[in-house]
């Protein structure tokens, strides 16, 4: 064996001595070495360059017969394996059971994504001298370790996180392999393509190959997990056994798992699935879940959540965190679900005179059940499961009737729609098991569970009969049955937690036509009504409009209850419903929400967006006028909110009837008693003639940088290299689904250094941007052209008055809020030299009447001071949330000059032009590398790493907000892993002065 290693090292060293040798140049030598090592193991063969054969695989596969037992990924000699370990490629490969990472000299071992054994080096290299030095003592150690490692795979999984990591890795492999398979034409792909085309035609019209690969992989992997979770024979597990665990409640699921367990299942995927089954056979899934979820997410005194559901979210985090966020896959806490279910039950009894509430089995004159229930975004079936529990509680003394009741009175009217195949799978299994525990186990073709795989927001229409009885036909049947629910059932109750996806992909004609009712008469340039949750509310409202009575009860994003662009939506809901109940659960960390007493307010979900429970009631009979709105709210920590919800329903909550008014129809209490006085002032958008929102890049990683030279080199490289969009996405870490119009960049012939200019990215954070419309989504040149390479100054504020700042260069649309507007003080003539005030002449003349000897800058300073007044912001807070701020005219010249002088101080501070910066008040006492590692604040010190800190930093400066940002914190956090220059260290200390002085001047303004 020693001879084999010596020949290998000798050949490797010879090739390494030549700089032009690439990673591929060592492959043949390495394959010979592997064959020598495994020569003594019967039936083993080495597959070289597995990527080219099957795609998305490590470079070498060691097989025993046809079964892979070891995967090896090889990198070039001298490459940092530490960095490779953290790469996206390795994240995918960690789904392999036995994996080795090597640079041909060092070997690292991973079992199911976890490091295994210590690395072994058979040689060391000197990159500078291009030499290789043997480590002879490790030859035998590598042989033994590789053979033992390949043979032994049956180790128990000891933690839920480890299992989630393995499942995520396997799912990524399946997803990536399917994408690879379907990217080329092959007879082997016929069945996969058939399934894809059927789903696209009947379920998801805009389905891409990438999304299909994701759906397929998730359903397969997580479906196996759920089957294993309910496996009563824990010592073994296989695809065939998983098939036996699938209930007869849904032919679609049965066909899917029959497809997986069958002999014709794609062999290129089968070995991955079998690997996962092998892992499951050595994992006590129920025990792991029991350990993993001993503490639930909302306090130990409550009933814990379903571990299967919470594990699914952890699986998504490992599999694709971006997908979890995008799809809004958040488990609805049980107290929320129970509150909604109890409230609906109460309303059915009280308002609709149905004595059995949700359990009521009465029928219409057409013989159809009256209380038809739908969860249009059912997810994993949490709401339907709770409804089932709630109804079953009424049968405690009538257990003998239960099976017959379920068969004839419950299943025909309990419906759920779900687009994602994995949650859909979980919902079916979970509901089936829940029913089994109550004593109902008999399903047949006529009485299946009414949970369907469909896109609620798509109108697929009635489907023709299909005579085939295979997997594809079962998908068609699923679509047909879902279409019947949408078009024929008189849905009376709609419940749920619809997804929150601002960048919605649901853009079908049917739902967009319905949403038009929410946009009538709106004149905003940007109407933010495309979030999925709004579409689901409109979808639910549509059913009640058709039925002419019913209830919608959902927990959603709460932006619609007081958003300005949501005013027509609120009016339309008032036209449809008789009573609307809004239980605001707050929890909006974006708005820095706190309890009325100043204590912490938390969200019931792990998200930043606030939420509310909304219950819309349309009573039977003719609708007259607009409906009534009742409001209540719960502040506090999550546990407090859950405790309140747990013991309440609509009947016990204390509601306040709102006196809403046009044109806004707010669903929250508002105090507009100061309206007459407020309206006497002028709106900033009336004072400034020209203004716009800031620049939209869509690709900050490309167009913006801290360093002018770095940005210059990057832009030149992009222009010269003409990368493909996919190369740009990989190279600059762009969103995979970016809508950036990169093709415009490809038209640029020459780099223009003059287009690199300072850019106000965030408050006190000026960077550099390549200001070229081809690189930007929206350049806003009409307004930003007044700043580009020109001397100007501009007010920065927003429509909801949450911040005010000043800027003297072009700026970002997210400068200090979601939509930051810029108001230039001056505009330039066509010659680009002569400037004139960008002010409304009539308003400016009013100021001249009060104080004759003033200029445009003085008016700006006066406004600036007023917008920093605590008293002003508190007094007019409700008005400031609606539109651009209005500023009162001064009573006299004395008041004007006092405020203008204070505003001038603020302006100079915020532009870093104040004399206050001549003397620093903070310290920076410790020397070091100046790298920002971990930012923390303690005892008036702002640490940037373990050793170095800024001293004497006042707490008021550290916590000071400008819009949605805390500049003293964000400026440093945005520079994590960067080494601060001397100028940056000084600049940060000036930020602290500016913030502390701003607080002082704000108090002066209100004196």
Positions of PLM-derived features:
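Charged, often low-complexity linker/regulatory segments
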Residues: 1-40, 44-52, 223, 238-240, ...
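Conserved catalytic cores of phosphodiester-cleaving nucleases, focusing on short active-site segments
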Residues: 30, 60-62, 68-76
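Preference for the N-terminal adenyl/adenosyl cofactor-binding alpha/beta module
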Residues: 153-386, 417-422, 454-460, 490-503
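Metal-dependent nuclease catalytic cores in nucleic-acid-processing enzymes
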Residues: 31-36, 85-105, 430-437, 530-543
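SAM-dependent methyltransferase catalytic region
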Residues: 47-52, 293-299, 303, 307, ...
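Short acidic loop-to-beta-strand element that houses the catalytic metal-binding Asp/Glu
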Residues: 54-64, 612
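Sequence-level detector for compositionally biased, low-complexity segments
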Residues: 505-514, 523-524, 542-1007
